[in-house]
Structure formats: structure tokens, C-alpha cells
């Protein structure tokens, strides 16, 4: 939940992977700089199990001059905002619908939009519109736009959610 709605809550220092999981994750996209770790965590969530040790074994080393790639400065924030859409596209590969329903149980109850494999882009778009992050909201709206423009998909949305063009018009309010 936190990875999708907020920010990366996991670190990769000392990350251990089984070879078969590693081979599914790599290579990471060259064009993604700040969110490579987060993308990897999302992919691991989709294809395997995450085990987090309770004991802190490793400490991050931070430079005082804020020159490292993850330093909190304006260029890092800009880069992260620009990478958000590519990062969220990672969720479109999810095939564990039950897991998505567990992750977003509060939003599913609030919106009455349940996940189905055939409506995954729409579902994730609706979930992103529930985020506080405007870049995630824009991504969500764009995914819904792309999905809804197809007449067959519009029919599926009506059948599963009673979603109409009137509902579609209201979604822009979530980005305002």
C-alpha cells in the first residue's frame, strides 16, 4: 500500500535475492534513476515473497554535501516526479488480484471498484486518484483515459461497475 500511495518504505542495502528472482528483475531500465530500488521492490512483491529482518544490520551512509543521487534536493525531487509514471506502470504487470484487493481494501470499500485482471489499468487508475500525490493522480487519470477510449472496455466497465461517461467526467475533480 505504502509503495503505491506514498513513497518507498524499503531500502535495498543488503538485499538478498534468489537467482531465479534476480533473473526476472534484471536488467533494470536504464532510464530510471531514483526509483530503481522501488521498482525492484514492486516486482519482487509481484513475483515472490519479501522477508524483512527486524534487526537493523546495515546503516546508510549519507554525505553532508548532498551530492549523492538520492540526496533530498530540488533535482532529485524533479527526477522522482518525472519517473513516477514509469514506476507505476510496474503495477500493470500484477497478476495476483487477491493481493491487490488486500493492499487496497480501504479504497475498494470507499470506491466500490474491485480489481479484475481485465480491468487492471482502470482499477489502478482509480486507486491512484485516491493518492495525495498529484503525479500519481495524473498517471491514474491517464490510465483510465487510455482504457476507457476503447468501446469494448467501456462496455466492461459498465457491466462490472455500472461506470458511465458521466462518472468519467467526474474523475477530473480528483486531480483538481
Indicate where each model-derived feature is located.
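A generic structural signal for short hydrophobic patches within well-formed alpha-helices
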Residues: 21-23, 41, 58, 67
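Short aromatic/basic micro-patch
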Residues: 15-16, 52, 59-61
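C-terminal subregions of glycosyltransferases and related glycan-biosynthesis enzymes
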Residues: 46, 56-176
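Acidic donor-binding loop at a coil-to-helix junction in glycosyltransferase catalytic cores
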Residues: 33-42, 79
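Exposed loop/turn and edge beta-strand positions of beta-sandwich/beta-sheet ligand-binding modules
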Residues: 11, 34, 56
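A recurrent flexible, glycine/aromatic-enriched loop bordering the glycosyltransferase active site
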Residues: 1-17, 84
Amino acid at each position: 500500500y505504502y509503495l503505491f500511495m506514498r513513497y518507498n518504505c524499503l531500502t535495498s542495502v543488503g538485499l538478498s535475492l534468489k537467482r531465479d528472482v534476480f533473473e526476472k528483475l534484471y536488467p533494470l531500465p536504464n532510464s530510471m534513476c531514483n526509483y530503481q530500488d522501488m521498482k525492484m521492490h514492486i516486482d519482487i512483491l509481484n513475483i515472490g515473497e519479501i522477508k524483512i529482518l527486524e534487526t537493523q544490520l546495515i546503516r546508510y551512509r549519507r554525505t553532508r554535501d548532498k551530492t549523492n543521487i538520492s540526496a533530498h534536493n530540488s533535482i532529485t525531487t524533479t527526477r522522482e516526479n518525472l519517473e513516477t509514471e514509469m514506476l507505476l506502470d510496474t503495477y500493470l504487470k500484477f497478476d495476483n488480484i487477491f493481493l491487490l484487493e488486500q493492499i487496497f481494501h480501504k479504497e475498494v470499500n470507499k470506491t466500490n471498484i474491485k480489481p479484475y485482471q481485465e480491468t487492471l489499468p482502470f482499477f489502478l487508475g482509480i486507486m491512484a486518484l485516491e493518492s495525495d500525490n498529484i503525479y500519481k493522480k495524473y498517471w491514474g487519470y491517464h490510465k483510465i483515459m487510455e482504457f476507457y477510449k476503447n468501446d469494448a472496455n467501456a462496455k466492461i466497465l459498465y457491466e462490472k461497475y455500472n461506470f458511465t461517461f458521466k462518472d468519467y467526467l467526474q474523475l477530473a475533480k480528483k486531480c483538481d
